[in-house]
């Protein structure tokens, strides 16, 4: 079957093309090459010579059809728009509850919970000066805390995302709340969207709690438990965001992320899990930078590559496993403290790139996130940005509206080649686990970060208000929203009372069972985490126990 859409030469094509190039060269004599963040040279004009559609069905196809370049579902956003999943976290569980209810009222169709930095560090609130608590996330250390945070939130109806690194205590607390409310665990939907320990080891050391092999063990146990008890929960979200925000180019980010997905899939297969059963619940989480067309091409290429990896390399038979389901967050790295209102425009461009690339859910950053955690007002503006793009700009009217653009299709092909080269390099190093363990990935990211910084310092790459178009500004930084210190002190005191009054015998038995599970290949560590949460064991106690048994998480530092 001849799939060609355009046959060259067109009548007069060469003459017209040559005339344009001559005219263009006279007007821009001495022009320097323009390159995107992945280093691909961007031409001034694209034509049928760059992409003529010869392999339309093989490389693009139709939405919902392999290789899913144009979208993973037939109707895409025309039939069902993306999920609006705003990241929320500040203060006490009661503070979170007030804000999450208002965000739902403002149009959010799913929720996320960001824990306090003390929680990310693996410790409880009574181990930290209260003035430091709740400034960058919500303090949730027990099932009671989670119950307060989710008061009135319809678990089993609304999708939840837990920013919850290993050993996934937030999910354990959530399951305890569901049991209290008589909610069937099988109805709970959402994602463990910080389960990608390799990305933490490489690029987000705050989230890194357990040793590399310990993290591997707990993740596999977590996936097995969720397959059995939580059929609608996504136990793994492979995170490219950390690596791109650390300095990886968009092409490198996609290559690293897909390499991690290959590693996790192979680990599950070696554990004896069915590949189709596992991949059906795989999801991805990415940064969306302001490099508009590059981001769109990154995601279109990523969909195509993942479909081929899942089907041909990993052997998945179910077409649902070939779908590249991803959440996008507009990039905070692109936001500036200078002239912060300009960030509203930046976030709008980033969000448009995400929508036009066909994401499944999105968080739009608030314009003040370069300064502090967003205020309630700026968070509402961020949600409204999505509503405006969807309902006023009608960006959902056409599926893959940039598909067929000579530029976008050529750039998608070029990004695909760059991404596949990264995957090949990781494969040659023995896979993503080995490549991270020896520092290859960290070195590559460092080199890209340095190159980007040099471009900023020379002015080759411009940021309005930072290295160009600077204006006199009030040097006073707007006050950051902070938790009520008295409320936080009361929260800590109640926590101390809880620890004194709970059953100490039950806690001791649960921690002993958790330690024994960590040292037994026959027991599931995450199952014991869930049981410990219901017995009143705190977040810090569970993390501390597993650190003793499986090793403390020390990331590799590359000089």
From Swiss-Prot:
Origin: domain of life: Bacteria
Transmembrane domains' residue ranges: none
EC top class named in words: isomerase
Biotechnology: This enzyme and the derivative PCM-F, a variant in which the alpha and beta subunits are fused into a single polypeptide via a short 11-amino acid linker, have potential applications in bioremediation of pivalic acid found in sludge, in stereospecific synthesis of C5 carboxylic acids and alcohols, and in the production of potential commodity and specialty chemicals.
One Pfam match: MM_CoA_mutase
GO molecular function, one term: methylmalonyl-CoA mutase activity
Subunit structure: Homodimer in the absence of the PCM small subunit. Weakly interacts with the PCM small subunit; an alpha(2)beta(2) stoichiometry seems to represent the active state of the enzyme.
Family: Belongs to the acyl-CoA mutase large subunit family.
Name of the featured protein: Pivalyl-CoA mutase large subunit
